[in-house]
């Protein structure tokens, strides 16, 4: 699953806005928005932070 889809999926499962996810990841709303639209790709550090956030919140991606 591409990172864009993972971001949208995680937000849906946790019922979070882009702003709320951004706050949890330590980035801006605009950054999450660009990631989800595919206009930017998270750095490795932010990708690891997102993966940790998902693990802590028990978000599981099928077919990972």
Model-derived features: positions:
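Short alpha-helical DNA-recognition segment
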Residues: 16-33
